[in-house]
From Swiss-Prot:
Function: Could be involved in insertion of integral membrane proteins into the membrane.
Bilayer disposition of the protein: Peripheral membrane protein
Main location: membrane
Entry keyword 4Fe-4S: no
Keywords: Cell inner membrane, Cell membrane, Membrane
Organism superkingdom: Bacteria
Renumbered residue ranges of the record's region Disordered: 63-82
Family recorded in the similarity comment: Belongs to the UPF0161 family.
HAMAP family according to UniProt: UPF0161_YidD
Protein name in UniProt: Putative membrane protein insertion efficiency factor
Subcellular location: Cell inner membrane
InterPro entries in alphabetical order: Membr_insert_effic_factor_YidD
GO terms for cellular component: plasma membrane
Length: 82
Protein backbone atom coordinates (compact mmCIF):
# COMPACT_ATOMS: atom_id res chain seq x y z
CA UNK A 1 0.00 0.00 0.00
CA UNK A 2 2.75 2.46 0.96
CA UNK A 3 4.76 1.43 -2.09
CA UNK A 4 1.85 2.26 -4.40
CA UNK A 5 1.35 5.62 -2.70
CA UNK A 6 5.03 6.52 -3.09
CA UNK A 7 4.95 5.50 -6.75
CA UNK A 8 1.84 7.65 -7.21
CA UNK A 9 3.68 10.69 -5.77
CA UNK A 10 6.66 10.13 -8.06
CA UNK A 11 4.40 9.74 -11.10
CA UNK A 12 2.58 12.94 -10.09
CA UNK A 13 5.96 14.70 -9.99
CA UNK A 14 6.90 13.24 -13.40
CA UNK A 15 3.73 14.47 -15.09
CA UNK A 16 3.37 17.88 -13.40
CA UNK A 17 6.64 19.36 -12.11
CA UNK A 18 9.29 17.54 -14.12
CA UNK A 19 8.22 18.99 -17.52
CA UNK A 20 8.50 22.49 -16.04
CA UNK A 21 12.02 21.86 -14.68
CA UNK A 22 13.40 20.37 -17.88
CA UNK A 23 16.05 17.68 -18.20
CA UNK A 24 18.23 18.20 -15.14
CA UNK A 25 19.06 14.66 -14.01
CA UNK A 26 22.66 13.58 -14.59
CA UNK A 27 21.90 9.87 -14.45
CA UNK A 28 20.27 7.16 -16.52
CA UNK A 29 17.66 6.10 -15.57
CA UNK A 30 16.49 9.46 -14.26
CA UNK A 31 16.20 9.86 -10.50
CA UNK A 32 12.41 9.67 -10.55
CA UNK A 33 12.45 6.53 -12.72
CA UNK A 34 15.16 5.07 -10.47
CA UNK A 35 12.92 5.69 -7.44
CA UNK A 36 10.01 3.84 -9.09
CA UNK A 37 12.23 0.92 -10.13
CA UNK A 38 13.76 0.73 -6.64
CA UNK A 39 10.31 0.76 -5.01
CA UNK A 40 9.09 -2.00 -7.34
CA UNK A 41 12.18 -4.14 -6.85
CA UNK A 42 12.91 -3.61 -3.15
CA UNK A 43 9.64 -2.48 -1.55
CA UNK A 44 8.72 0.74 0.25
CA UNK A 45 11.44 1.02 2.88
CA UNK A 46 14.58 -0.02 1.03
CA UNK A 47 13.31 1.36 -2.29
CA UNK A 48 12.66 4.79 -0.77
CA UNK A 49 16.08 4.69 0.91
CA UNK A 50 17.82 3.87 -2.38
CA UNK A 51 15.83 6.55 -4.21
CA UNK A 52 16.62 9.30 -1.70
CA UNK A 53 20.27 8.24 -1.65
CA UNK A 54 20.34 8.54 -5.44
CA UNK A 55 18.66 11.98 -5.40
CA UNK A 56 21.33 13.17 -2.94
CA UNK A 57 24.02 12.12 -5.46
CA UNK A 58 22.39 14.06 -8.30
CA UNK A 59 24.22 17.38 -8.22
CA UNK A 60 26.48 19.37 -10.56
CA UNK A 61 29.72 17.95 -9.10
CA UNK A 62 28.77 14.33 -9.76
CA UNK A 63 29.58 13.13 -13.29
CA UNK A 64 26.39 11.02 -13.43
CA UNK A 65 26.09 8.29 -16.05
CA UNK A 66 24.50 4.86 -16.01
CA UNK A 67 23.43 3.87 -12.49
CA UNK A 68 21.02 0.91 -12.42
CA UNK A 69 19.01 -0.16 -9.38
CA UNK A 70 20.97 -2.84 -7.50
CA UNK A 71 19.66 -6.38 -7.51
CA UNK A 72 17.87 -7.66 -4.44
CA UNK A 73 20.30 -9.26 -1.98
CA UNK A 74 17.86 -12.12 -1.35
CA UNK A 75 17.78 -12.99 -5.06
CA UNK A 76 21.56 -12.74 -5.26
CA UNK A 77 21.98 -15.19 -2.37
CA UNK A 78 19.47 -17.62 -3.92
CA UNK A 79 21.28 -17.48 -7.28
CA UNK A 80 24.65 -18.13 -5.65
CA UNK A 81 23.31 -21.20 -3.79
CA UNK A 82 21.99 -22.85 -6.97
Amino acid sequence: MIKKLLIYFVRFYQYTLSPLLGLTCRFYPTCSEYMILALQKHGAMKGAYLGVKRICRCHPWNPGGHDPVPESTILSKEKSVK
